[in-house]
Amino acid sequence: MARQSAEPPTDDGQSAKEIVVITGGNTGIGFEVARQLLCNYGNRFYVIIGSRTLGKGHTAVAALKQQGYEAVQAVQLDVTKEASIAAAAKIIGEQFGRIDVLHVNAGVLLEPTDINAKPVPFSETIMETMRTNVAGAAATVEGFTPLLSIGSNPRVVFMTSTAASAQLMHQYSSMTTAPALSASKAAENIIMIYYYHKYPNWKVNACYPGYRDTAMMRRYNASSLSKAYRQPDPVEEGAYNAVRLSLLGKDGETGTFTEYKGVGEDGQRQYSALPW
């Protein structure tokens, strides 16, 4: 394929392309969102992959550039460390002057042995999960709020899960296998709603990617937590809704919790609301 050109910022630090930041964008759904934005909307977006380990971020960028996508770079970004978030925001602000889309994608799914490689109290697993999935999500939005506020159409996409749904969890016992994740994603949805109300001129939404073939899900399926009854679905489809929410205009939806549902009879991709 023809190689895309990376657009440098203008003299005032602004870029004509929309600037997208994806936390945890070096792998899984986050990486696929980056790939699809560059593949299908490369003339519109410049993508910044946030990675806890900068080396992994550079590896992800190299993989994308190998496919011909140039409008991408990496930044070190650990959502559990406010200093890391602040440093990333400073780098991006000095280079581009703003961001337009923030994907709050970084997250963890811990087993009761993941923290110390030995059994730990359930409460400790909850606290460690909340540190990334909830406090980290909020810290990320807070850290990038000044740059988002400069843009004319800020969009924030929280990558969450149906594991957050009390209604579904009450109805299906199979959804109780990862309660720390469920509690964290329910709290993350509340954080999303908080920002939806706080910034009425932004587009703030929650997105469920589905049960997808990512490294996180493969680890989960091999763990003691899993009651998986089928193989995960292709990762490509898991990015569709997040990409859609990235494209929203000033009159687009906000305050929603949605997922991709497949292709309808009209040949168009279908999306639906999920129960809280």
Curated annotation (Swiss-Prot):
This is Short-chain dehydrogenase/reductase ATR10. Belongs to the short-chain dehydrogenases/reductases (SDR) family. Its EC number is 1.-.-.-. It comes from Stachybotrys chlorohalonatus (strain IBT 40285). The lineage of its organism: Eukaryota, Fungi, Dikarya, Ascomycota, Pezizomycotina. The gene is ATR10. One of its GO terms (molecular function) is monooxygenase activity. The keyword Protein biosynthesis does not apply. Pathway: Mycotoxin biosynthesis. It comes from the Eukaryota.
